[in-house]
Amino acid sequence: YDWAPPAVEHQGRADIDGVHYILAAEESVRTGAIVSGQADIARQISAPQEGLLENKGVQIISHGTNSINNQLGFRFNHPFLQDKRVREAIIHGIDREEILRVLFSESYPLAQSSVAQTGLGFKDQSAAYTFDPEESKRLLDEAGWKPGPDGIRVKDGKRLVLRSNTALPQPRSKEVMTMVQDQLGALGIAIEINPGDQATQNADAKSIDKVQLYHIMVGRADYDVIASMYSV
């Protein structure tokens, strides 16, 4: 390669002879390769491993999606989620700061909107995502969901039980959903987490009866990427 575009500062032959990709599904293999010098770059390093690598002199570089943040998408055609008050109760019932503190690192900033800060059309909507469990309880009471004998809220004889997928490619999805399960359970909202493998997750996600809270992230950088949310 010896024909760089005129706008590029470096002209002439590339500084490196090539790039070799090694597919390593196990994180321990990836971290071991970079610590031992067998690799120069490793992707998909989990938050708990960052400190270990930094102590070994490895630089951690993180970046947002340029698109849709890691989030829970409401399938609001489901009868339990059609009421906006229930959706708002779920939002205010999740302590995002606690989740970040327990599971993640400084590489994962608190989201301010569905759209990432580096995404096209970003607008700070932090006020809509505040943690306020008392407001959650008020909204659920107002929507007619009253605590049942086991603590799970009930309306018209139906328990407020919602099912979530596990987004296996996304960082610590199962752990995140487990914390969400605990936080919302304290408010009387039962969350069932789909335990299936990737094939099962993909198949079940197509049915609103099997998945009502969809853990999702989109990496495309096009301006109308939020439209992706309307297809799940």
Positions of the model-derived regions?
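Short, well-structured beta-strand/strand-turn elements
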Residues: Q44, K146-P149, G185-T200
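Extracellular/periplasmic solute-recognition and catalytic clefts
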Residues: H20-H78, R85, A89, E97, ...
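Acidic-aromatic pocket-rim loops
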Residues: S113-S114, Q201-V232
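Aromatic-rich, solvent-exposed beta-strand/loop patch
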Residues: Y1-E26, Q49-I68, K146-P149, V154-D156, ...
